[in-house]
């Protein structure tokens, strides 16, 4: 029975409908892969973050199944109570070695890590400097820290330099995505590291969309640019390129020891399930022994980038498997996604507040499980649907 106290929700949902901003869930199956079943149809999946195609890899699945039988389906408690099981420590040691750091700490999700770590490092007398296009979880973590939040223009090192020079904050924390999740471009980590060195600021890098994909060992953008030792806080996820679930922070041992006591999402959450840890360990072994997956992925990326550029899309700065097909209005993005689905392509419309008004888009994501024919097929389908989309409207401010 509906309760009167919630009657206001109906009007809120109608307002979301009117703006083209109402979300809904849509199951896929049977598992992640380059082709999935959606609504009873087989569609090529171009909106997953399973960049290396490991979520359904038999070795990764077998490791998870074995861990479930050995250690149980769940951890049963927080790590600090009775939930610290052997797979947790084994995965943390492997992650620390992979990232070239002294230690690592697991979190329940990337959102958990980003929401909790800033507050363990800074507070009321401090300042956090955050790229304006950082992920929502970073923004929320900065706000929860109660430090002054200073947002600088996207990848604008000069503006950040001025802000750091003028601040009187006790502690300074610069936070950035490595790869920006909606645009696919890379942060200028070398320049950011130089600024942080000069101004005595801590550097926090979210490698969610870079770890497993970039660098000689797949360890991320910091490895690719040779600045691993100059990043204080390495955050990454286990649920994207590694195909599992959860997240981690890697860094100096004293940093990890502080987070064990002060990172509230770690302290007050049940530990990651052992099967997720085992799956991530198996995925890390594949990353180490099969660099051909990354080579194949970036060959596909070059093909997609060239094709989208021919269609007139601005993808010159893309440095990842993420391609923004910016269409402008919510209506155009939704229409494009629907038309592509009719042709056999599963790609989502991304709308405000995920992206700024006037920049609604298709977020196209490639996987090492795709092939060149699928890239070419998508480009042909996109070219076919573009002329029939609703007309573009002037971009709104904000």
From Swiss-Prot:
Q: Might you name a Gene Ontology BP term for this protein?
A: biotin biosynthetic process
- By its UniProt entry, which InterPro entries does this protein fall under? Aminotrans_II_pyridoxalP_BS (IPR001917), Aminotransferase_I/II_large (IPR004839), AON_synthase_class-II (IPR050087), AONS_Archaea/Proteobacteria (IPR004723), AONS_Proteobacteria (IPR022834), PyrdxlP-dep_Trfase (IPR015424), PyrdxlP-dep_Trfase_major (IPR015421), PyrdxlP-dep_Trfase_small (IPR015422)
Which positions bind substrate?
A: 23, 135, 354
A Pfam family for this UniProt protein? Aminotran_1_2
Q: What is its EC number?
A: 2.3.1.47
Which catalytic reaction applies to this protein?
6-carboxyhexanoyl-[ACP] + L-alanine + H(+) = (8S)-8-amino-7-oxononanoate + holo-[ACP] + CO2
Instruction: Please name the PROSITE patterns in this protein's record.
Output: AA_TRANSFER_CLASS_2 (PS00599)
Q: Which NCBIfam families match?
A: bioF
Gene3D superfamilies xref list: Aspartate Aminotransferase, domain 1 (3.90.1150.10), Type I PLP-dependent aspartate aminotransferase-like (Major domain) (3.40.640.10)
Keywords per UniProt: Biotin biosynthesis, Pyridoxal phosphate, Transferase
Question: Of which family is this protein a member?
Answer: Belongs to the class-II pyridoxal-phosphate-dependent aminotransferase family. BioF subfamily.
Molecular function terms from GO:
8-amino-7-oxononanoate synthase activity; pyridoxal phosphate binding
* Native source species: Anaeromyxobacter sp. (strain K)
Pathway terms, separated by semicolons:
Cofactor biosynthesis; biotin biosynthesis
* Assembly: Homodimer.
Described purpose of this protein according to its UniProt entry: Catalyzes the decarboxylative condensation of pimeloyl-[acyl-carrier protein] and L-alanine to produce 8-amino-7-oxononanoate (AON), [acyl-carrier protein], and carbon dioxide.
Q: What is this protein called?
A: 8-amino-7-oxononanoate synthase
Disulphide bonds annotated for this chain are none
């Amino acid at each position: 029975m509906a309760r009167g106290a919630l009657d206001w929700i109906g009007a809120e949902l109608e307002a979301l409908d009117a703006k083209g901003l109402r979300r809904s869930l849509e199951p896929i199956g049977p598992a992640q892969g380059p082709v999935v079943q959606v609504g009873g149809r087989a569609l090529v999946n171009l909106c997953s973050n399973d960049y290396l195609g490991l979520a359904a890899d038999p070795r990764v699945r077998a490791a998870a199944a074995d861990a479930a039988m050995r250690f149980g389906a769940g951890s049963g408690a927080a790590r600090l109570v009775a939930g610290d099981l052997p797979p947790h420590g084994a995965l943390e040691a492997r992650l620390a070695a992979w990232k070239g750091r002294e230690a690592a700490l697991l979190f329940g999700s990337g959102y958990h890590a980003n929401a909790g770590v800033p507050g363990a490092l800074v507070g009321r007398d401090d300042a956090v400097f955050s790229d304006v296009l950082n992920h929502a979880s970073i923004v929320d973590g900065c706000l929860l820290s109660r430090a002054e939040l200073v947002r600088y223009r996207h990848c604008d090192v000069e503006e950040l330099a001025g802000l750091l020079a003028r601040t009187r904050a006790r502690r300074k924390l610069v936070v950035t995505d490595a790869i920006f999740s909606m645009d696919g471009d890379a942060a200028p980590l070398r320049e950011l590291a130089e600024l942080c060195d000069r101004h005595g600021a801590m550097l926090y890098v979210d490698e969610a969309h870079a770890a497993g994909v970039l660098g000689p060992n797949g360890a991320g953008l910091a490895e690719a640019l040779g600045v691993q030792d100059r990043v204080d806080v390495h955050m990454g996820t286990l649920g994207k390129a590694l195909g599992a679930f959860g997240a981690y922070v890697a860094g100096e041992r004293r940093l990890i020891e502080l987070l064990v006591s002060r990172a509230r999402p770690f302290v007050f959450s049940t530990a990651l399930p052992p099967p997720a840890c085992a799956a991530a360990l198996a995925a890390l072994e594949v990353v180490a022994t099969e660099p051909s997956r990354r080579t194949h992925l970036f060959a596909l990326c070059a093909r997609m980038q060239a094709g989208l550029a021919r269609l007139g899309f601005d993808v010159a700065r893309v440095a990842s498997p993420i391609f923004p097909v910016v269409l402008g209005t919510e209506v155009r993005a939704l229409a494009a996604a629907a038309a592509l689905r009719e042709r056999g392509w599963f790609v989502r419309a991304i709308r405000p507040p995920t992206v700024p008004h006037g920049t609604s888009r298709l977020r196209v994501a490639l996987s090492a499980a795709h092939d060149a024919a699928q890239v070419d097929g998508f480009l042909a389908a996109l070219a076919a649907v573009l002329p029939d989309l609703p007309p573009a409207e002037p971009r709104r401010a904000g």
